Curated annotation (Swiss-Prot):
Protein name per the record: Ig heavy chain V region 345
Miscellaneous comment as given in the Swiss-Prot or TrEMBL entry: This sequence belongs to the VH7183 subfamily.
Region (Complementarity-determining-2) residue spans: 69-85
Entry GO CC: extracellular region; immunoglobulin complex
Keyword Repeat on entry: no
UniProt keyword terms in alphabetical order: Adaptive immunity, Disulfide bond, Immunity, Immunoglobulin, Signal
Framework-3: region residues: 86-117
One GO biological process term: immunoglobulin mediated immune response
UniProt-annotated stretches for the region Framework-1: 20-49
Source organism per UniProt: Mus musculus
Organism phylogeny: Eukaryota, Metazoa, Chordata, Craniata, Vertebrata
Amino acid sequence: MNFGLRLIFLVLTLKGVKCEVQLVESGGGLVKPGGSLKLSCAASGFAFSSYDMSWVRQTPEKRLEWVAYISSGGGSTYYPDTVKGRFTISRDNAKNTLYLQMSSLKSEDTAMYYCAR
């Protein structure tokens, strides 16, 4: 009986490793003030189209700021006033990819950007 429980636990553990959530950001770079940049986030390991998604950033002072939200179907988006009208979040559920188009960039937009589920 004990052996059977161990075997089931081992199988469940191995299955869990296969389902690891991964979010891989790309597209960053150096841009002058007033410039534009488009970030991408490739998602895997979960049903991307079923989840609302966001972009957050960490400033050089290590402060975390939320910058954009999009609903699972893409019909609803929200932004803080600091980026509204300059940043656009979008998604391609067929490609499991999240995007952030940033324009009219300012020095205060300098940060590390991360996508979040």
